[in-house]
Amino acid sequence: MKIIYLISTATAILLTGCNSETSEKTAQEIIQIATGSAPENISAEATVLAADGSVLREGSNDWTCMPGTPPNENVNPMCVDQAWQEWLQAYINQAPYDSEAKGFGVSYMLQGDQAVDNNDPFNTDRSVGTWVQEGPHLMLLMPASLMSDLPRDPYAGGPYVMWENNEFVHMMVPLEVTERPD
């Protein structure tokens, strides 16, 4: 619960001043958006956070679902296990994260995601980097050393490494064909 509170607090701070759809949606609609990102046997008992970090529903398993990550609330929902909760806390705060010292983690994003640079987690300049917008996918955390044989090209087909040479490195597992942007 401590990690959920920390994520909630960090998310609320980051969302100050962001354009949010949250005020236009009911709590039940936000819960449906968030829980639609994972299989029902996970999301039905998960804790659900609003985009502002407040707890909309307490859960009874170790999963947390949210309607999106800042500033894209209600657009790219995800359900994450406890390892991903810790990763998100570090990512949101741009704090150190050592994948070699952490355990395995799973994140579901069955509704897809916004376009991101596969090379740099904080790049917002679409003229630089390798941009990819995934449809439904899983994200897996593990020691970076275990990902050495995976491709780095998000368009190669199958799992690939995102954000190599960065402490937020993780494995992407697309569940549909990843199309190159036009």
Predicted regions and their residues:
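Eukaryotic compositionally biased low-complexity/IDR segments
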Residues: 3, 20-21
